[in-house]
């Protein structure tokens, strides 16, 4: 969990399977934040399919609908339907005005986002409304543990049947690199499970097409 003032950004898998019991437990855990904090969730591989992204089926919009948390009401500025054509916060954008940072746009995406998700995000950040905002993009799978040159590589494949999908290198090429105002990417997903901090976090910096640095950070709190 990353905490900035009164906003909480969460990027880790909520479940380790998609059973009703898991969804109920996750929903109950977040309930203490409802109507108080505008938490933002990035869905992971275990939120889809029967256990691990065999398909795009998910209960996310059922348990986390927009009207669940009144703290989202004035902050959510855009969203598009999920893989099943259902209105959902899986792909959504939230705008904040911070005294120190100015205008911030946080975009969260489904696991292994489809082309239409990346196209939506790219057009949104380049729009007249948000072209001067500092943008944070969240997605579940993107970066491997470590830092360059030995680690911190951008993921170029995912071993899931989910389709269509874009992996880390494609997210970089299609969205991050050509966008001039995305300044930070946050992801989760990877880790070695050995309880060593350095093996369960990742970080790298690369410049976008405008020559501006994009900080890319992975952390996996389950390990």
Predicted regions: what is each one?
Residues 1-7, 13, 44, 134-140:
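Active-site beta-strand/loop signature of hydrolases that rely on acidic residues for catalysis
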Residues 2-4, 48-49, 144-145, 193:
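Short, active-site-adjacent cap segments at secondary-structure transitions
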Residues 2-20, 66, 146-164:
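Acidic/histidine-rich helix-loop elements
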Residues 32-35, 86-90, 95, 103-204:
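His/acidic metal-ligating clusters that form di-metal
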């Amino acid at each position: 969990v990353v905490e900035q003032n009164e906003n909480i950004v969460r990027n880790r898998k909520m479940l380790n399977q998609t059973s009703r019991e898991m969804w109920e437990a996750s929903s109950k855990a977040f309930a203490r934040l409802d109507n108080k904090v505008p938490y933002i969730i990035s869905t992971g591989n275990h939120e889809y399919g029967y256990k691990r992204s065999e398909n795009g089926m998910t209960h996310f919009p059922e348990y986390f609908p927009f009207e669940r948390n009144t703290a989202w009401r004035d902050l959510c500025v855009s969203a598009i339907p999920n893989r099943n054509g259902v209105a959902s916060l899986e792909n959504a954008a939230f705008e904040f005005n911070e005294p120190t940072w100015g205008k911030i746009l946080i975009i969260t995406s489904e696991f292994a986002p489809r082309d239409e998700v990346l196209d939506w995000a790219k057009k949104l950040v380049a729009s007249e409304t948000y072209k001067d905002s500092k943008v944070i993009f969240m997605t579940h799978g993107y970066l491997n543990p470590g830092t360059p040159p030995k680690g911190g590589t951008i993921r170029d494949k995912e071993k899931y049947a989910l389709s269509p999908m874009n992996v880390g290198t494609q997210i970089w090429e299609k969205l991050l690199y050509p966008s001039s105002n995305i300044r930070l990417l946050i992801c989760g997903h990877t880790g070695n499970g050995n309880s060593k901090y350095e093996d369960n976090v990742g970080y790298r910096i690369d410049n976008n097409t405008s020559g501006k640095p994009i900080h890319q950070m992975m952390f996996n709190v389950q390990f």
